[in-house]
């Protein structure tokens, strides 16, 4: 038992080191470390333990940074399966895992796959978390950005305007997130006039 506790502490230290590598953009090193951490967590803690789930998510994040999307899809899908089974489909953690998968589809340029996921995530977050929870405007923004990539500029502009209105109300007109939303709205507005 003492060895297992030592192993778990060592794994946490390795994960912290992998996060540092990710932060420093040494993604390949982060992936290398996290593959080992995940393998050991699966052995010591099983696939459903929260630290195993976090290790799987961290590995997927670093893989996404080096465009290894297929493995990311698999890792995030496994976390979604486990979260849905343990917590239910509308639990905030399940929705966070779904969002990570949808964002990976977006990063991979698979906008048609990302779009229905973002629609569902947004609807669930409004229902579960409410319109003003920080995750909700992020979901609306992800959907708006996806629609823009699909050339659906008018639909995207409507969502971006909703985001601006919500962020002005909740965060204030000068908050960096509000300013970013205005910038995205202007980009979409110009695309509408150019089309």
Language-model regions: role of each:
Residues 1-195:
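Intrinsic-disorder-linked linear interaction elements in eukaryotic regulatory proteins
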